[in-house]
Curated annotation (Swiss-Prot):
This is HTH-type transcriptional regulator BudR. PANTHER family: SMALL NEUTRAL PROTEASE REGULATORY PROTEIN, TRANSCRIPTIONAL DUAL REGULATOR HCAR-RELATED. The keyword DNA repair does not apply. PROSITE patterns: HTH_LYSR. It comes from Klebsiella aerogenes. Keywords: DNA-binding, Transcription, Transcription regulation.
């Protein structure tokens, strides 16, 4: 089974319509329908119920959708991790945060954004008072 089939399946499941999914994927509708048909043959059961105005997932399609989304997310994460390592963005990052700033929305958002963009980097947060953080920085315990 190719990842491409999973991407096509997820697009149709989200759009609930072959033509809209094809447009979102940048392909024409007939090849998309053919790929979904091949996927259903490979799985051995229909994944969609064809309706007059779109499609809906079958029970098997619902279960397959959940796993397909997980597989695609893992595939994307693996790709980003490898790219990060190739750019030298891997390892650990230790940052210090004062207790008063630990839950500040902007700081939390920045850390989360960094983690998403640099999946190969493990971020460790140390919460302490300013004098302790300064000492830890001087000792090389924080980046």
């Amino acid at each position: 089974m190719e990842l491409r089939y999973l991407r096509y399946f997820v697009a149709v499941a989200r759009e609930r319509h072959f033509t809209r999914a094809a447009k979102a994927l940048g392909i024409s509708q007939p090849p998309l329908s053919q790929q979904i048909k091949r996927l259903e043959e490979e799985v051995g059961t229909p994944l969609f119920r064809r309706l007059t105005r779109g499609v809906e997932l079958t029970e098997a399609g619902e279960a397959f959708y959940e796993d397909a989304c997980k597989i695609l997310a893992l595939s994307d994460a693996a790709l980003e991790k490898a790219r990060g390592i190739a750019r030298g963005l891997n390892g650990n990052l230790s940052i210090g945060i004062t207790s008063s700033d630990a839950f500040h929305p902007k700081i939390f958002a920045l850390i989360r954004q960094f983690q998403v963009q640099n999946m190969a980097v493990q971020v460790h947060q140390v919460e302490a008072n300013m004098s302790s953080l300064t000492a830890m920085l001087a000792e090389g315990e924080l980046d």
